[in-house]
Amino acid sequence: MIFLSIGPNYTWAQAWRHMWTRGNKANASKLQSLLTKKYDAQKALLFSQGRGALAEAVRLATGGEGKVAVTSMTCFVVIEAIRTAGCEPLYVDVDRHTLQFNADNLRRATKSEDVRAVVVQNMLGIPVEIDEIMKVAHEHDMAVIEDLAHAVGGQYADGREIGTVGDYTMLSFGRDKMIDTINGGALVIRTTDVKNVVQPPLEEVPTIQQLRDRIYPLFACLVRGLFASGLGKCIHWFAYKTKIVVRSADDGTHPERTLPYWQAKLAYEQLKTIDKKVTMRLKNQDIYQKELTDFSVAASSNGVRWPLLVENRSEVLAKLKQAGVYAEDVWYEVPV
């Protein structure tokens, strides 16, 4: 069986190590140093969630007021982070082929609005036209926040690494991401023109949440292993019903919480080897591109996801399930 969700980044051995990993302050410092070097930055902060890092990026970029331009194809936690920072989202239309907004759409959307920043997401690892978007941002005095939730290890068309162009770079270490510690995130500050006082997250993650983060990979391996018998489905239902496991989007936004040391250690190890992971995923993507050309959109630059445009999604999911491929953890039914 092939699972496209439920802990796909973890084997039993990796899940066991995740459960028992220990860390210390030095691990957090090593991760911060790696981030500042990799993204040519002034400072790096570690958060318990990617959305917490994004909320702080928005607060610093805008002063906590005005609007923030964001792609209309996005996750609701992005909107939650923007509002946590005191701002409101301004949705920008996306292109059907790239699934990203372009410079013209951004210019039209922001023409008569008080937009203080733009979040560049590079959704599904598909790179935007970054130079043109940067021009629009400079014309309208907007800070540029590169959201790397889907884009770690990817490149723009000119070869520059995603995350090395804007004023702020946000990373997510959430489940199913390129760097996967179940929860976690980072903010890399690449500008000196901040509009607010930097507030490093100091509050510890509650013990119950850390326990959930530790056991999730083992839970996922168990569910996957027993899924065909039907027992895995029962375990999955029971764990969520009793809140032994919670959905990644259900915990709110907490920019005050810092990344636990043990997760910082795991994130550092994964970031060090990200190029190898990207190479492997792009090889797999090439196979999909050749076999499913009629359904594909623009290619991802890091292989984090490979989207297909189909007429009848339910029918496709049912046929995949018959073939032993479980892809039912879909994102949203409709755009924002």
For the regions a language model picked out, list residue spans one by one:
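Short hydrophobic/aromatic beta-strand micro-patches
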Residues: 188, 307-311
